[in-house]
Regions:
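A conserved active-site cap/scaffold subdomain adjacent to cofactor or substrate pockets
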Residues: 312, 319-328, 337
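Metal-coordinating catalytic core of metallo-dependent amide/deamination hydrolases
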Residues: 40, 174-300
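Active-site gating loops and adjacent loop-to-helix segments of metal-dependent hydrolytic enzymes
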Residues: 114-144, 237-240, 271-286, 302-310, ...
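Divalent metal-coordination and catalytic microenvironments
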Residues: 53, 70, 75, 96, ...
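His/Asp/Glu-enriched, well-ordered alpha-helical/loop segment
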Residues: 330-415, 431-433
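Alpha-helical scaffold segments that flank or form the walls of functional sites
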Residues: 116-188, 212-221, 466-468, 474
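Active-site microenvironment of metallo-dependent hydrolases
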Residues: 1-68, 73-76, 381-477
Length: 477
């Protein structure tokens, strides 16, 4: 069944039992908070000390502490030590918790978050690509805002402090503006990668005028948000639903982005395009590729030489058939290619960075074994500091380093699935779950405390997403 032939009845099958009232009621019990986060509604930055935590700094110069303190003032990390004296600071008791950098996602299609009720893993006609391709062109700016907020709310609850919003369904600059407003209003750090709307003609360049308009309106800002482009595939690809452009068109799109000083990201599903991109002179340190599944040793040498980074989405990639390739984390690490970790989507699975690390560890041991060492600490680095390196923001975040911005989380170690704890890195990779995330701090703002949002109205976020989804299905017919 072609994507375009999906009917409203097909999409609504199984989704009509959404039970709006019940969903709102049960989820509100799990997360409660104050008024909806919006411009000016975020918690204030201040001065506080994380006291008595097990500190994993991800900075060799700072080191780790079995028990230590982190001093934060006006959104910046002031000190990390065994003991910090700051009489005027508010104390956050973190005894029995791990304090670590927040997770950094490097590739996530947030606009698809509200499509969960319409997706199915058992019905091919309601698969992710079929549904998103069929409905993408019907999205309004309001839909984008609601869907991005829904995805970011789950990201926040799971311990993310930075998300790369891979927005490959931008019809107009108004649609882009809506997604950026959602990102700003949620208070997380992130990159917004502007990509053509679903079904955009392959023989036409992306909307570079709209991209320039968004850059003028949003950049520079307070360094919480950066901008890039999400490119259509270049050359042959198994995923024809996401666009396949020629090298000449890639030069137009990528050249337009580079003229604006913006980085580029692109999927590499199917036949590897790396040699084609290299021959065309398109690769560089401003390029991020996604899904490292079918690269060769020669291609990886090129990527290292050009400074290209690669994002792996372990949960989604592990669901692909063997013919699509395998996650090549070991090969990337062995070749010295920059790598990072990402969620990809939440339509058919949940946000769980701990699970992502476990998947990578298990697949690595199964396929590679001890030939290429991979420790729990290295995986935590992949999920934090390496993501900052990939997104070009390591000077601001990714580690608990004095002078960097205070993007950090507290993970409870006394919960039944975590205790008793020995090695904190192994506990994070092998045992932890999103429900163990106690506190989330982004740019010095405490966005979650004791497992509850501090300013976000969870019920309102969910209600808006449900209403937008219902209206979308009605418009699609």
């Amino acid at each position: 069944m072609k994507a375009q032939s999906i009917s409203r009845r097909t999409l609504l099958k199984g989704a009509s039992a959404l039970a709006v009232t019940g969903a709102l009621s049960s989820l509100s019990c799990a997360q409660t908070g104050g008024s909806s986060a919006g411009a000016g509604a975020l918690p204030a930055r201040g001065e506080f000390i994380i006291r008595g935590a097990t500190i994993l700094s991800m900075d060799a110069a700072v080191g780790d502490f079995a028990r230590g303190d982190v001093h934060v003032r006006d959104g910046a990390i002031v000190a990390v030590a065994k003991e910090v004296a700051a009489p005027s600071a508010i104390v956050i008791d973190a005894v029995g918790m791990i304090c670590m950098p927040g997770f950094i996602d490097t590739h996530w299609h947030l606009w698809t978050s509200m499509l969960r009720p319409m997706l199915s893993t058992d019905d091919v006609n309601r698969g992710y690509f079929q549904v998103t391709n069929a409905l993408g062109r019907f999205f309004t700016p309001r839909d984008h805002y609601a869907s991005v907020r829904l995805g970011l709310a789950e990201a926040l609850s799971a311990g993310a402090t930075t998300v790369h919003n891979w927005a490959h369904n931008i019809a107009t600059s108004d649609h882009a503006d809506a997604e950026l407003r959602a990102m700003r209003d949620m208070g997380l750090r992130g990159r917004f990668s502007y990509g053509p709307v679903q079904g955009a003609p392959n023989d036409q360049p992306m909307d570079l005028a709209g991209l320039a308009k968004i850059k003028q309106q949003w950049m520079p800002n307070d360094d919480m948000l950066t901008l890039g482009i999400a490119s259509r595939n270049v050359g042959d690809s198994t995923n024809l639903l996401r666009g396949n452009i020629s090298v000449d068109m890639a030069h137009k799109d990528w050249g337009g982005a580079r003229a604006l000083g913006l980085p580029i990201t692109m999927h590499t599903s199917g036949q590897s395009p790396i040699m084609l991109l290299e021959k065309a002179g398109l690769l560089g340190p401003d390029v991020q590729l996604v899904h490292p599944l079918l690269t060769t040793a020669a291609e990886r040498d090129i990527l290292k030489a050009r400074g290209v980074s690669y994002s792996t989405s372990p949960v989604g990639e592990s669901q692909r058939p063997a013919s699509a390739g395998v996650i090549q984390l070991a090969e990337l690490l062995e070749s010295g290619v920059k790598a990072s970790m990402s969620i990809d989507l939440t339509g058919t699975y949940n946000v769980d960075f701990f699970q992502c690390m476990r998947f990578l560890y298990s697949l690595h041991r199964h396929r590679v074994g001890a030939r290429v060492p991979l420790t729990a600490k290295r995986l935590v680095q992949l999920a934090t500091l390496d993501g900052a390196v990939d997104l070009g923001i390591a000077q601001r975040t990714g580690s608990l380093t004095p002078g960097k911005r205070a993007d950090m989380i507290l993970v409870r170690t006394g919960d039944i699935n975590m205790a008793p704890m020995a090695d904190p890195y192994e506990a994070l990779v092998n045992l932890a779950q999103p429900r163990n995330v106690d506190t989330v701090i982004a740019d010095g703002r405490v966005l979650q405390r004791a497992g509850r949002f501090t300013a976000l109205d969870h019920a309102e976020v969910l209600r808006e997403a449900i209403e937008a989804g219902n209206a979308l299905r009605a418009r699609a017919g």
